[in-house]
């Protein structure tokens, strides 16, 4: 039975100090649960914050943007607009393709959104054109989200059509079945087909038309039910040779008779095996390829999805011929893993630095071991709670744990320092542990709950930013809570068993030198503090000046949204004149690709030309540039982008827009640059009037660079103006005219070839090699009422006009999106303000609306809520401190330290050339929690000295400052060194971590110096104020 001195209660720690075995086993359980949790946690770049997004693609080869808008997009939009939970609907209608992107509220499950989309498509089916080759196809994917993996399939022995067929049937389908995969697209889509190229002159010479040929082909190739014979004993299934499978069979097809002689299709057309769409092409490192882009579902775990695909690839490639090569060109998870590893290393480095600081101050191995055990135990135990909350190991949660390193050690240091003080006075270790832990218990609780109060507003941040930082805040809060538990249980128990007067007094030369140094520092601080207390108004002036300076710095500092990351992948758009053809774009992309591949930082390149839903117009091309690993190149991604744009600038007739891919994607459409601003009107005419004016104004702003818009209304169009009276007299309808034009120039899919594995199309078109351009229209002939043929020119006049290449809608109304980057020397905040000022200058009419999109819109929302977020953090902390101290005054004293943290953080960011972005703001909020710890430790001891020893307020706060100087310095340095690895980070993802480290290190350095002097002065000021109030209102004193 242990004999305890009287009064050694130990508070909440008593039970754990007296039961070391139970305490040890409890901590072992926490450790084991954390280790198991770590192994179960998935790995990701960031928390899953994707909006539920679904893309609906409808292909209608040959249809103009106007036809796609009115006949396809508009009916779909009307049905989609009725869905509940829809946040935003955007669409793009271009030649032959309609893409509708539906973004839902964060709270709506993706499966529910999928059901609503399917129901809306079903409701719109009867409103869509009857000759659509395929119904609308939806995918659970955000088109702006870069692919998680890009594979190139090439062959030096097989045509791309055969390669595409094998990839589609043997590889793409299997990858699509992987859990987490939202969409697998085959860029360059050279699907096999039978192409029928009519010779217009030969057809006309025989008195035939393209419609005659089309009817003959569709009637000769069918695949329908034929029934069966059911006899008395046997049943017989009926089948026939109604399918034609090869180009040779179609070539021999009889389409008409002339003078009793058969006219075969091969007599009037070139029939060959080819590609379904001859205006699509993809290249990998300039070699023709089928480029397979794998996109994940919103919310899917990117690491698990990519791992499943890689495990499957060897088996899939074995089924392909040896001449077919599958190459993984990019895998976003490579950089994600590297970034997470770097952050894990920084976490371990932070732990090592914190333990080093502890040893430097305590200079005692047993005393160093105790917090050295508490830190990893608190961090590892957090993993168990993270599993329960469905969190992941990502950059933000690891950053939270790295910052927590400096937080969690504070509690252990405060406990050890207080217990050690009693042991050095001669008390037994057990009694000292009980007394010291009991005395410091309230302080630990105050520190813990006031720090968690700072994090509470983060949990209530709205929209995607709030969802993003929820894991950060909760992870940090859990680590702090576990730390408090460990500090009140394990730490005093270990102190009672491991510390003694002999071990604490045992010193070597190094220890004695450090002790002398600390004594001199404390003595100097005491002399300085005495002078400060004698001149309080000067100190108060400094505190007030600090507050004003923090406000001024907040106003002038450049503001951003989210750090631009170097993930080693660059997305690009190549833009050419609006009338550019597929052939000219293919040639231009070859020139650009040659320049890009010469850059030493580039590892591989994929390019794509054509219209397929991902790319909207023929005059644009998509690029994906994969850079070498960061440690294998000399330049960061922005420097590479500048160099590539300079290299391509000398190629005439092209504009290259590049942007680095990011882990956080908020946009719903692929953009040319990082930021977007939309202009919306009720009519296209209103847009056409204001778009040039606004674009010219934006291009003149120095705060913006690479300004462009998706407004393209100068595409060449041939307007067929039919004389309806003449056509009617000849018995020719508008449907006949449309069919004739579609047969000739629409790559019309007129029939389907069915096989056991796939379906292939028969494509009809005119061979325009000998009659390019508008001259090809002169070859069109139509069947008149009397059975003869009439040239199109007999009933129509051809006019050349300008027409839009694409028509974009936002929530069913016409819209144009301006894309821009922010040049060096300016911030996103500067650009946003410049755009708003320009909008006011132009005085846009009421029927014209503007709105920022994507990350720019999120920046506006975050910027508007930042001040309120900080205010909410301060108010929450005031409430918690007021409840703990049962005082209205003391919480104000503690919170008076906050401006010093803001000044230091903002100055550090400005000196480092960093913007005040979301990450840096989180750092400032955390500083609020750290800096007030110094004041809490001072005020707690001052109040205790006044109550228990009857000291005057001045003597009490003076003694408290001296007694708590060492633990304050120790805990501040621990927090500073915990953030230092983040500030000095240089690896993959360093852009994300560095602002947090800079803000915290700068804030801690400045606040450490100032709060040691301003806090006692403000404490005495409020004490005098309290006495004054009591003297003026004695009733308050009586009631008290």
Curated annotation (Swiss-Prot):
Membrane topology field: Multi-pass membrane protein
Cell compartment(s), UniProt: Cell inner membrane
Superkingdom, natural source: Bacteria
Record's signal peptide: none
Transmembrane segment boundaries: 16-36, 347-367, 369-389, 396-416, 440-460, 472-492, 537-557, 863-883, 888-908, 910-930, 968-988, 998-1018
Keyword presence, Protein transport: no
GO MF, one example: xenobiotic transmembrane transporter activity
Annotated InterPro entries: AcrB_DN_DC_subdom, Acrflvin-R, Multidrug-R_MdtB
Keywords per UniProt: Cell inner membrane, Cell membrane, Membrane, Transmembrane, Transmembrane helix, Transport
One cellular component (GO) term of this entry: plasma membrane
The keyword Protease belongs to this UniProt entry's keyword annotation: no
Oligomer status and interactors: Part of a tripartite efflux system composed of MdtA, MdtB and MdtC. MdtB forms a heteromultimer with MdtC.
Similarity comment text for this entry: Belongs to the resistance-nodulation-cell division (RND) (TC 2.A.6) family. MdtB subfamily.
HAMAP family, per database record: MdtB
Protein name, entry field: Multidrug resistance protein MdtB
Organism: Salmonella paratyphi C (strain RKS4594)
Gene name in the database record: mdtB
